[in-house]
Regions:
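Positively charged, small/polar-rich N-terminal and surface patches that mediate targeting and assembly
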Residues: 401-405, 420-579
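Glycine- and aromatic-enriched membrane alpha-helices
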Residues: 1-456
Length: 579
């Protein structure tokens, strides 16, 4: 007799874990550059769609088809008897639940190898992960294999899912090599900021939400007081560890970099979730607190280590989130387990080193197996299909070359142009931010004016001038109002990109100084004849002035001829209804 409550709960968990694919897709897309967004979305879609039939083909059988020490059994298309699992839910419900876990392990790899991986190669190694790599590791820990018989404990996958995916992510990123431009000739890292942290943050929120199904659903039961109590503890510990890790990462980066790092803090949330996954059923809330605390610091130090010392280019921090904290979470069971649901209590709860030793042994053996198998697979792929795309493809972006997609954002702006600005510092501050109090020298420094040289040989002053104004987009409304007040009613406005470099600009991304960044600006062009050029220039300078170098620049050109298409009027007459 199946339990309807347990069946529904397991299905809800499976559906939530499936929706993690959306979270991973948004997170990875936001942490990478816009020219590769379509490729990121395609990979996150296809690793699940490829993994599902592969896991059905032989993966589930290898994982749960028997109680052998090393593998379950060879059972193509799941035709065998699985009564030894002792399920009180339908087998197909359990298969769905395990399938989405398998897909999660495969999708972790996408982030660390982003922006330079051959799409065909990605499809092949995603299939390999779902066919043999994840199922065999999963059998050792969950399917009755040798680690499970020794008392190895991994409730929902810090080791089986995140550590396995993280090890593959680390190996793949190392074998691929860094993205073009990531390191200079001396090996110093350059920051390559993600193009949309809004999408990245939404992805993290989705993942956090779905993690209640990932961990909570792993109980497979809500039919007794004991299982309901355990599931409640699992969900509470999951949330607590993630929240603590997020706070710790924010504070740690604030102290370390001078400002709280947004992308690192988002990684901190995921680090806490990964770390608590192994022991969420067996640690107390105090244990969850300390697990999250360590995870929040570990993820920052790990990102810095792989970025600056190991020189492994991981665009989204997948290695630090999933590998480093998967390892930490698995070890933490041996430290903080209260003895509930584990063979031995943790070291800090009087259980000695027994559980800790088992956890360490399991990690070493699982990681060794994964590295050996995936190294062979990556090498075969590299020699046949090619693991990495050519340099010109990487530079142009994978979207256009791999998928024929000009832009994943066709018709939409992808920058928050209203807030983007160079950070003021001691080298740019002019000492006065009130335009009414600013001196002429300060005004000229903030908004320089460049006039076309007067040429006398064959060129005369027509009395008509083009004034071209380059300014921050956020200042457009003030500039437009100032020009309208002068009587200028016709203007051409163009959105452009530009930058200025001032020594000492304190921009950092994930602890690495950011190089020159193109920022959204506007170019406003007006043609004047009746209105004084000097009046236009002064009005523009007052509208744009903030007290810092880089407020804008004004160019003044002599105009030799103007023709109005509608009436045929020329020069001065052609301008009278647009001023």
């Amino acid at each position: 007799m199946f339990s309807s409550v347990n069946t529904c709960w397991t299905l809800v968990g499976a559906f939530l874990v499936y929706f993690m694919q959306a979270g991973f897709a948004l997170c990875e897309a936001g942490f990478t550059r816009a020219k590769n967004t379509g490729n990121i979305l395609m990979k996150n879609m296809m690793d699940f769609c490829i993994g599902t039939p592969c896991y059905w083909l032989i993966g589930f059988g290898l994982m749960f088809g028997g109680t052998g020490a090393l593998i379950g059994g060879f059972d193509p298309f799941i035709q065998g008897d699985y009564s030894h699992l002792g399920l009180d839910i339908p087998l197909w419900v359990y298969i769905v639940f395990q399938t989405v876990f398998c897909a999660t392990a495969a999708t972790i790899v996408s982030g660390s190898m982003a922006e330079r991986t051959n799409f065909k190669a990605y499809c092949v190694y995603s299939a390999a992960i779902s066919l043999v790599v994840y199922p065999i590791c999963g059998h050792w820990m969950w399917g009755g294999g040798w680690l499970q018989s020794m008392g190895f404990h991994d409730f929902a996958g810090s080791a089986a899912v995140h550590n396995v995916g993280g090890v593959i992510a680390l190996l793949g990123a190392w074998m691929l090599g860094p993205r073009i431009g990531k390191y200079d000739k001396d090996g110093n890292p350059h920051a390559i900021p993600g193009h949309n942290l809004t999408a990245g943050a939404l992805g993290v929120f989705i993942l956090w939400f779905c993690w209640f199904g990932f961990n909570g659903g792993s109980s497979l039961s809500l039919s007794t007081d004991a299982t309901m109590t355990m599931t409640g503890l699992v969900c509470f510990n999951t949330n607590l560890a993630a929240a603590v890790a997020t706070c710790v990462t924010m504070i740690f980066t604030w102290l370390r970099y001078g400002k709280p790092d947004v992308s690192m803090t988002l990684n901190g949330s995921l680090a806490g979730l990964v770390a608590i996954t192994a022991g969420c059923d067996t640690v107390s809330p105090f244990g969850a607190f300390f697990i999250g605390f360590v995870a929040g610091i570990l993820v920052v130090l790990s990102v810095e280590f792989f970025d600056k010392i190991a020189r492994v280019d991981d665009p989204v921090g997948a290695v630090s989130v999933h590998f480093a904290n998967g390892v930490w979470g698995t070890i933490a069971v041996g430290l903080f387990s209260t003895g509930s649901n584990t063979a031995h209590a943790g070291l800090f709860y009087g259980g000695g080193l027994a559980q800790l030793g088992t956890q360490l042994l399991g990690l070493v053996c699982v990681d060794a197996y994964v590295v050996i198998v995936m190294f062979i697979i990556f090498k075969i792929i590299d020699k046949t299909l090619g693991l990495r795309v050519p340099a010109e493809v990487e530079i142009d972006g994978l979207d256009i070359h791999e998928h024929g997609l000009a832009s994943a954002y066709a018709g939409f702006a992808i920058s928050d142009a209203n807030s983007a600005a160079m950070t003021p510092n001691e080298n740019t501050d002019l000492g006065e931010d009130d335009v009414t109090m600013a001196t002429a020298k300060q005004m000229d420094a903030a908004v320089p004016v460049v006039r076309e040289p007067v040429i006398h040989d064959g060129v005369y002053d027509t009395g008509m001038h083009k004034v071209s104004i380059i300014a921050k987009l956020a200042k457009f409304d003030q500039l437009k109002t100032a020009l309208n007040d002068l009587g200028v009613t016709g203007m051409t406005v163009t959105q452009i990109m530009g930058c200025g470099i001032q020594k000492g600009t304190p921009e950092k991304y994930r602890g690495v100084p950011v190089d020159t960044t193109l920022l959204p600006k506007i170019k406003v062009e007006v043609i004047v004849s009746r209105i004084s050029v000097d009046a236009v220039v002064e009005a523009a300078k007052k509208a744009l002035y903030t007290g810092h170098i880089g407020d804008g620049k004004i160019f003044v050109y002599n105009v030799t001829r103007v023709v109005k298409i509608r009436t045929g009027e020329e020069d001065y007459a052609a301008l009278q209804d647009v001023e």
